[in-house]
Amino acid sequence: MNLLNLPFAGPQQVFSAEWLEMLQIEWNRREGLSSQLRQVGFSSVVAFGVPHEEQPRAYLVIRNGEIDEAKKQSLGVPQWDLRADESQWQSWFSEPPGLLALGMAFTNRSLQFRHGNYPAMIKDPLMAESFVRSFALMSRAQKKLESEQQN
């Protein structure tokens, strides 16, 4: 239970089709993130999952900074595949991490990149800021979904 005594929708729900749809809406609605990614020409398949599972639980197809598709099934070979334990995802969706927290998570392997080059990405200020913003949007999507489910 969280501090408001409301059940937290854990990772199975975090990576649900409903959550992915909400993430796509929030991501594409927020001009800051998509315009930053458009500036650097970011187009990629990004996947999220947990370390002990072979396949990711969620896939995003990002074209010129905007999410074109967000699905639970494979949308191609991911260029970025981020993995973390379920409890870590829960923590990040409750309180989105900053750049320092993400760096520490990468260093201690609680955030793993099966595909993608974190050290190179983090050296680019626009990409680093976009990476942090993406976690904030994931949290926002989770909170909006929880709010809708309560009403």
Which ranges hold each PLM region?
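Feature captures hydrophobic
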Residues: 1-151
